[in-house]
Every structure is written in C-alpha cells, then in structure tokens.
C-alpha cells in the first residue's frame, strides 16, 4: 500500500514541481539573463559597468535588458556616473523596440544632472512623467561618488528613493502591467561616459 501510494503521488506531481528555481536577477559574475550590445557592458568586481568611453555613443541611447519580464518588484543598488553630461537610468515595465541597437521604450527611473530621482518616459509621449524635487536632490546627491538608489513598483504605483529620500511616490495609470527591466547608457559625445551599478538587490513581490 505504501509503495502504491508513493507511485500515485509521484505520478500526480506536475513537471513544474521538479523545475529548478528561476535564475537570479543578477548573479554578480556574468551577464547571464541579460542582453545588450556587448561592446558597452561588462561585469567588474560584482558590479554591472556600462561604458561608451572613449568614443561616445551617437544617435540613440542603448540598454542592457533583462530577458525576463517582471510585474511587481523592489530593486536597490548603488550607482556612480562618470563623464561630462553623464546620464543613465533604469527602465521598468518596458519593451525593446529595436533589437539591433537595444533601444527601449517605457518608464525610466532617471539618473543624471537635473533628472536624478525623476520618472521619465523613454520614447513615450510627454517625456517626463514625474520630476523629483530639485532641492531634495541637491541636499542628498553625491555627484562624484556612489549613490544609493531604490525603485519599488507595485501595481501602478512607483516609489523612487535617492540616498534614502523619497523623490517620486505616486500612481501612473498608463504604465504597463509588466515588462523588462533595463540599465541605460545615454547617447554622449566623445569621450563618452561610464555608469557603474553595484550591490544590486532584487525581490519580486507576489
């Protein structure tokens, strides 16, 4: 009887019950689970580094994109930008619209002069979705050092924090229900720019 019961139990288990855990958001060693133009992206000492140095990048922004789509999540990391006019960001609930250049459309948690902590609509009508308060950014920003940055996305609600201070906290009803996450390198003139994302922590919210 015990043998028969065990056989029945195994037979009833779906293949999903034996499936491996999903791949980590970022494994800290490689760009497994991510896609982009290889010349611009690498992993250094556990950090994602994007660089357009020394030639810059003209004509379009480019992105390192997750191969998975995500709905609700929390993402935190430290970011440092180098280079005159350096600008970057993290796309949320977005989509790739040009796979050859890895051009992306959707909401972006922005980083760079005049945009730190804002929610920007990359290739969306109207551009800026919600500006961060300039006085709050000025009070906490470390322009030449690593800054703590966090993004929480639940339903249509987005919260962005810079060095612990809330910069955006609101509902965005036109935002898609799911999409990719992507790290941005903004188009820049020579000698280009560099963005380093380290201490990356990610949690899906079920």
Show which residues each predicted segment covers.
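Positively charged n-region of N-terminal signal peptides that target proteins for export
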Residues: 1-4
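Bacterial N-terminal signal peptides
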Residues: 7-16
